[in-house]
Amino acid sequence: MALRGVSVQLLSRVPGLRVFRTWVSSAAQTEKVGRTQSQLAKSSRPEFDWRDPLVLEEQLTTDEILIRDTFRTYCQERLMPRILLANRNEVFHREIISQMGELGVLGPTIKGYGCAGVSSVAYGLLARELERVDSGYRSAMSVQSPLVMHPIYAYGSEEQRQKYLPRLAKGELLGCFGLTEPNSGSDPSSMETRARYNSSNKSYTLNGTKTWITNSPMADLFVVWARCEDGRIRGFLLEKGMRGLSAPRIQGKFSLRASATGMIIMDGVEVPEENMLPGASSLGGSFGCLNNGRYGIAWGVLGASEFCLHTARQYALDRMQFGVPLARNQLIQKKLADMLTEITLGLHACLQLGRLKDQDKAAPEMVSLLKRNNCGKALDIARQARDMLGGNGISDEYHVIRHAMNLEAVNTYEGTHDIHALILGRAITGIQAFTASK
C-alpha cells in the first residue's frame, strides 16, 4: 500500500463491558454487585505495558499508525531477510530505493510533485522502522529525502522541482549530498571546493573533492555545495555523466557496510547556470538540509535501540546460567530498565519535536538536542546489549554488533556528538566556543 492517497476508515469502538441481566434473589444480587464493583475497580487500574510505557500509540493519528504499520511490514519482510549478507558483503541494493519509491516514502513530507505530504511525525516513524533493520538503509532514505529532495523543494526553481522531484520520489533517480571534504568536516565554512562563473556560456566550473558521501557511487544526481567567487556558498545540481565528475567508492568500512559510501571528485565540471539552486546563497542552505536530516536520525536511532532492547531481553529470558535465566539477575534487569527508560523518553521527545516542526515552531537547537541525546543513548544501548549477549554478542547473526558498529558512524555524521554540545552551549551561554579567536 503506497502512502500517496492513503485513506483510513475509522472504526467505532465496541464497549468492553457487557452487562448480563439475570433473575436472582436480592441477597445474591447484592453480593454480585459487590463483586462487580470490585472487579471494575481492579480492571480500571492503569496497566503498564513495557512495549509502550508512556502510551505513544494513543498520541499518533490513525494515518500515522497506518503508514508506520505498512512500512514496518515492508521493512521486516523485504529488508530484514537480506541485511545479514548485505552487511557481510558490503553491498547496497539499488532496487531498495525503487521499492521505497513505489511505497511513497521518499520525500514524504513534501506536498505535491508526486510526494505523499505526510506529517513530520509520520516521517519520523518511517525512519524508526527502517533503522530497526539497519542504519545504512535509513541513511540512504535520509539522504534521498531531507538532503536531496528538500533543498530542491526549498531552494530550487520551479523548473528544477518539476524536473527532479517526481523522479526522485519514484526512486527513478538516486541522489547524494556533497558537503564534507577531506579537510573540511565539522567546519564546513572552510570548504575548498570552488565554483567559477563563465559569463561566455552562462555556466559554472566546479573543482574540488567531497568525501564520506552516502549514495555517491550509485548516484544519478549530486547536490554539491561550493564557494563562489563572491565568497558565498551555493548549491549546485550535478548529473551523472558530466565530464570531469567521478564518484569512487570508499571500501573497508566497519560501519554502515550496507550503505554505498564514496567521494565526489570534480575536475573542471561544467554546470549550467540553471543548475544552481537560486534560493540558497550561504551555509544556511546546507544547514537547513542537515536540520531535517538530523530530525530523522533522532527517530531512526531509537528503532535500532528498540531492536537491541528486544533482542537482549529475549536472550536474557532464554539463556540459562547457574540454573536460572539471565533475566533473573538484578544487574540484567537494571540494564533493561535503563534501556527502556532512555528509549521511551527519546521517543516522546521526538514526537513533541515532530509536532512542533509541523507548526513551524522547531528551532535548530531542538533538533541538535535530540540528535545528540538519542544518538549517544542509542550507542550506549547497543553496546550494553552486545555485552549482555556475551560471546554471541559479536556474531552478526544476532545483529546487535552490527547496530553497535553502525551507531558509531551515526553518532558522528551530520554533526558530531560534541559539535551539537557546542551548539547547545552557545544557546545556553550566548557565547560560541567553536573557535578561540571569535
From Swiss-Prot:
Keywords of this entry: Acetylation, FAD, Flavoprotein, Mitochondrion, Oxidoreductase, Transit peptide
Pfam families assigned: Acyl-CoA_dh_1 (PF00441), Acyl-CoA_dh_M (PF02770), Acyl-CoA_dh_N (PF02771)
Localization per record: Mitochondrion matrix
Main localization category: mitochondrion
Keyword Magnesium: no
GO annotation, cellular component aspect: mitochondrial inner membrane; mitochondrial matrix
Substrates-to-products reaction catalysed: glutaryl-CoA + oxidized [electron-transfer flavoprotein] + 2 H(+) = (2E)-butenoyl-CoA + reduced [electron-transfer flavoprotein] + CO2
Residue numbers bearing the N6-acetyllysine modification: 240
Recorded metabolic or biological pathway in which this protein acts: Amino-acid metabolism; lysine degradation; Amino-acid metabolism; tryptophan metabolism
Quaternary organization: Homotetramer.
Protein name (Swiss-Prot/TrEMBL): Glutaryl-CoA dehydrogenase, mitochondrial
Naturally occurring in which organism (per UniProt): Macaca fascicularis
